[in-house]
A protein has these predicted regions:
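Residues located in well-ordered beta-strands
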Residues: 6-8, 18, 23, 35, ...
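Mid-domain Rossmann-like dinucleotide-binding core that forms the NAD(H)/NADP(H) cofactor-binding site
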Residues: 144, 150-152, 156-226
Length: 226
């Protein structure tokens, strides 16, 4: 079924974003509709509004969010109504040679889900019925969103959704840099330049990895206090 709700939209590059009422279509095969509980604000959202990330407006912003499944489309078996999920803003088909090799971040089908669901038909429209693009296949700076299950990860319902939202980008980017890029080992000395949302999660990741010493550098004293 269709639903209406508020969303944050970039209508024009280098102009203030606007909050509008939008219409969200119900899920098709392999999709679910979410009630969004919380959405982080990432620097990538800013980059989409100024053209640094070249995605065409009108664009519903937001790619790191958490919410509850309220409707499931045909063929969905991995999620059910009532499940809590976080978004995954990098689409993966699960079938190409990179996905099959355990490197889904390099999925050759990513381009299918940059501004629409991977099937290619917009699920999000403005009040006049005109289609809206969605940022990185998500567009979750909104009250509702219909997404492919490939863009979602089920989580424990005990996890507060306002905290879980950050796992969609800030946490995975920071912790992933520690374990997958730098490959920090126990006893390492780690320097972290910048203590924003990602930097703080690099620090946490380094701690989990067993770093002997973590050096945090920031331009604002308030961030170091955290």
């Amino acid at each position: 079924m269709q639903r209406t709700g508020k969303a944050v939209i970039c209508r024009e590059l280098n102009q203030p974003v606007v909050v509008e009422t939008i219409v969200i279509d119900g899920p098709k095969r392999g999709e679910v509709t979410l009630r969004i509980a919380a959405c982080g604000v990432c620097h990538s959202d800013l980059s989409a509004t100024n053209g640094t990330i070249p995605l065409p407006p009108p664009l519903v912003l937001g790619h790191e969010a958490a919410g509850e499944v309220i409707e499931a489309g045909e063929g969905v078996s991995s999620l059910a109504v009532g499940d809590h999920v976080v978004t995954n803003f990098i689409y993966m088909c699960g079938k190409c040679r990179f996905c099959s090799a355990g490197r889904p971040v390099l999925c050759i089908e990513q381009g299918k889900a940059l501004t629409t669901p991977p099937e290619g038909t917009p699920r999000t429209h403005d009040a006049a019925g005109k289609p809206l693009n969605i940022f990185s296949g998500c567009g979750v700076m909104a009250e509702y969103a219909t997404l492919s299950t490939d863009n979602l990860v089920k989580i424990d319902p005990k996890i507060p959704l306002d905290r879980a939202a950050l796992v969609g980008c800030a946490v995975t980017t920071g912790v992933g840099a520690v374990f997958n890029t730098a490959r920090v080992e126990p006893g390492s000395i780690v320097a972290v330049f910048g203590c924003g949302g990602v930097g703080l999660n690099v620090i946490q990741g380094a701690r989990i990895a067993g770093a002997e010493r973590i050096l945090a550098l920031a331009t604002r004293e308030s961030k170091l206090e955290m």
